[in-house]
Amino acid sequence: METNFKSGFLSIIGRPNVGKSTFMNKVIGQKIAIMSDKAQTTRNKIQGVFTTNDAQMIFIDTPGIHKPKHRLGDFMVQIAEDTLNEVDSILFMINADEGYGRGDQYIIDLLQKVNSPVFLIINKIDLIHPDQLLPLIEKYKSLYDFEEIIPISALEGNNVDHLVDVLKEHLPEGPQYYPEDQVTDHPERFVISELIREKVLHLTKEEVPHSIAVVIENIEKNENEKLLIQATIVTERSSQKGILIGKQGTMLKNIGKQARRDIEALLGSKVYLELWIKVKKDWRNRQNQLHEFGFRSDEY
């Protein structure tokens, strides 16, 4: 390893649905953090690893900051706050088309307590007129002393390469923590469950999305060398179970079809996906079930 190899951990933080997962997936080049047009889709810290010949960045994608409504919400916000004290740099991401809000001030107040450099990332610049950008920059400049302010469009890829170069410049010298071909530190089961959950979020509406968890029950190869994946979608109410199954099972088939496509792309092999639905009342407020479904923390 060269003596000037750089590496570091970077936290991506912001209000719900500002495009944090979209940005990380664009940088890494694979879908490892789920994306949805519904807020609060990211639950566990997801580490995306980006490696070049002279640097390695480990991105931590946190739940969006929001006012919690239940113990799962408390858990999500606690993860986001904890990461501020664990990382080498912080990326505070905002939506260009939403402007300054109370949720942003809450995050800025949190940032006053940290020593790591903070970069303001203004995302979704493709949704505003260029004349709207400068007033937004001036507003945030008056609120906090950011290391740099960088406008991007994570979805379109605009200015993302420049942002990565800037972040690389600020990395400390350090070891290569992960092999160069590794893009996440999460096991396959976790990423597969996230891909299934993404399809539920995308295809269902109203109260169903944030009332669901996905548990991978079994992964094995069958006699035809096809990967058999069995998973359970857990929801809180029987009425939600009906929505997830759909008329004559059409919704569940749709979820399975779309999830299978992404899982096959991830694993590079043919997949047979079996999905079941289970009702676990009020699971988001039950510590033992949060633990069972993969939310491992003393801060539920």
Swiss-Prot record:
Protein's UniProt keywords contain Acyltransferase: no
Subcellular location as annotated: Cytoplasm; Cell membrane
Annotated spans, G5: 152-154
Pfam families per UniProt: KH_2 (PF07650), MMR_HSR1 (PF01926)
Predominant place of localization: cytoplasm
A GO biological-process term: ribosomal small subunit assembly
Membrane topology reported for the UniProt record: Peripheral membrane protein
Location of region: G1: 14-21
Boundaries of every Era-type G domain copy: 6-173
SUPFAM superfamilies: P-loop containing nucleoside triphosphate hydrolases, Prokaryotic type KH domain (KH-domain type II)
Annotated segments matching region G2: 40-44
UniProt region (G4), positions on chain: 123-126
NCBIfam families (UniProt xref): era (TIGR00436), PRK00089.1 (NF000908), small_GTP (TIGR00231)
UniProt cross-references to HAMAP family, sorted A to Z: GTPase_Era (MF_00367)
Protein's name according to its UniProt entry: GTPase Era
Native source organism of the sequence: Oceanobacillus iheyensis (strain DSM 14371 / CIP 107618 / JCM 11309 / KCTC 3954 / HTE831)
Gene designation per UniProt: era
